[in-house]
Amino acid sequence: MKTVEILFWIGLFIVFYTYVGYGIILFLLVKIKEIFSKNENNKGVRDLPEVTLLIAAYNEESVVDSKMTNCLELDYPTELLKIVWVTDGSDDNTNTLLANYQRADVLFEPARGGKTAAVNRAMDYIKSPIVVLTDANTYLNKEAIMEIVTLFNDPKVGCVAGEKRVLSKDKDTASAGGEGLYWMYESKLKDLDSRLYSAVGAAGELYAVRRELYKHMEKSVLLDDFIQSMQIAMR
């Protein structure tokens, strides 16, 4: 066999493994593990902890009202759910609109230092044991907070990643549909990763951490969600 043919088949194998093979092997490993492991169900009703929903936003006036409506509809005791916005550098009507909502705590500094710096600063203010981080243009299922909290019943869990679903509009159904399929597959892989040992990263649209495990990151960090979740998984 010629060198070119060998390289071709090696390259083809790498592509196949990356997009399909890894998922197949992961699925088989999870099934083998579950056959020989005890099924521990940590879900159930326990004393609910105080939770802070943290939203880092910059000039998000177009979604403030819809986001707050979504937050206020979440199925979690009002007295245990704090809603904190950090809006550093915003110079539109974001802060003005948020002032209309009594439950919205707003942290604001005129200078914009980036999302990572804003989240770091907000974490110094937050005291609740569980912090759920989400984007201003991300809308949560009503049960999302409750589902996340139940996973923290397991003391070995330090970070929980949410599942992203893309909502499509008529004008871009094809492109959004393709993105939606990608995220469905990505979410399935993360689910299998967590069942085998641990997921290898969380999407910034929705993830939660134990406050005590959060570590400040350098302002220059761009993938703050990935870095933070990986640091927790490594402990």
Segments predicted by a language model, with ranges:
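Acidic helix N-cap motif at the loop->helix transition within catalytic regions
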Residues: 62-66, 80, 92-100, 143
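Cell-envelope/extracellular polymer assembly enzymes that use nucleotide-activated donors
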Residues: 49-52, 82, 227
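Short, acidic, metal-binding catalytic loop of nucleotide-sugar glycosyltransferases
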Residues: 69-80
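Conserved donor NDP-sugar-binding/catalytic core segment of glycosyltransferases
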Residues: 142-177
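N-terminal membrane-anchoring/stem segments of glycan-assembly enzymes
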Residues: 1-43
